[in-house]
Amino acid sequence: MVRLLGIDPGLRFTGWGLVDVDGNRLCHVADGVIATDGDAPVPERLRCLHDSLLDLVRRYGPREAAVEETYVNRNGASTLKLGYARGVALLVPALAGIAVSEYGAMAVKRAVVGTGAASKDQVEMMVRRLLPGATIRRADASDALAVAICHAHHRASALRVSAGTRMA
């Protein structure tokens, strides 16, 4: 069994979700949202995000992590700030020795729903279906669980390819 941490980074709200994977079985462990004070200076918000993610890594001990890639919007300042949060989300697990993968939003939607054009509601519905018993309170947490599920699917495919290569 492998524990995966999915992260949907944001400077105001960062979603996180933990999933245990055993073969093709997924089991919800925990999820939530890290909220930073929107009135605080950016460095303080990044420190809050760092400390909270570090606490999650220490508390739950994931073996692998996956982070959603940043989309670029028209507001360059917002995109840059999102990039700061994403950097923290990539760095914390990496410093803990955890392998980190990255997935774009369309890849996550395709892995969870079957189409890269899925709506947020469709993604959340499938996350709830794939992880029965998960009590998801915010869309950010649902997105993070979707990132973890996406990584589980990609990981399983890579393991099958690797096993096939060894047998040949």
From Swiss-Prot:
One of its GO terms (molecular function) is magnesium ion binding. Mg(2+) 1 binds at D8, D140. PANTHER family: CROSSOVER JUNCTION ENDODEOXYRIBONUCLEASE RUVC. The RuvA-RuvB-RuvC complex processes Holliday junction (HJ) DNA during genetic recombination and DNA repair. Endonuclease that resolves HJ intermediates. Cleaves cruciform DNA by making single-stranded nicks across the HJ at symmetrical positions within the homologous arms, yielding a 5'-phosphate and a 3'-hydroxyl group; requires a central core of homology in the junction. The consensus cleavage sequence is 5'-(A/T)TT(C/G)-3'. Cleavage occurs on the 3'-side of the TT dinucleotide at the point of strand exchange. Belongs to the RuvC family. Its EC number is 3.1.21.10. Its cofactor is Mg(2+). InterPro entries: RNaseH-like_sf, RNaseH_sf, X-over_junc_endoDNase_Mg_BS, X-over_junc_endoDNase_RuvC. NCBIfam families: ruvC. Binds 2 Mg(2+) ion per subunit. Mg(2+) 2 binds at E68. This is Crossover junction endodeoxyribonuclease RuvC. Its main location: cytoplasm. It comes from Gluconacetobacter diazotrophicus (strain ATCC 49037 / DSM 5601 / CCUG 37298 / CIP 103539 / LMG 7603 / PAl5). Homodimer which binds Holliday junction (HJ) DNA. The HJ becomes 2-fold symmetrical on binding to RuvC with unstacked arms; it has a different conformation from HJ DNA in complex with RuvA. In the full resolvosome a probable DNA-RuvA(4)-RuvB(12)-RuvC(2) complex forms which resolves the HJ. Keywords: Cytoplasm, DNA damage, DNA recombination, DNA repair, DNA-binding, Endonuclease, Hydrolase, Magnesium, Metal-binding, Nuclease. One of its GO terms (cellular component) is Holliday junction resolvase complex. GO terms for biological process: DNA recombination; DNA repair. HAMAP family: RuvC. It catalyses: Endonucleolytic cleavage at a junction such as a reciprocal single-stranded crossover between two homologous DNA duplexes (Holliday junction). Gene3D superfamilies: Ribonuclease H-like superfamily/Ribonuclease H. PROSITE patterns: RUVC. It is an enzyme of class 3 (hydrolase). SUPFAM superfamilies: Ribonuclease H-like (SSF53098). It comes from the Bacteria.
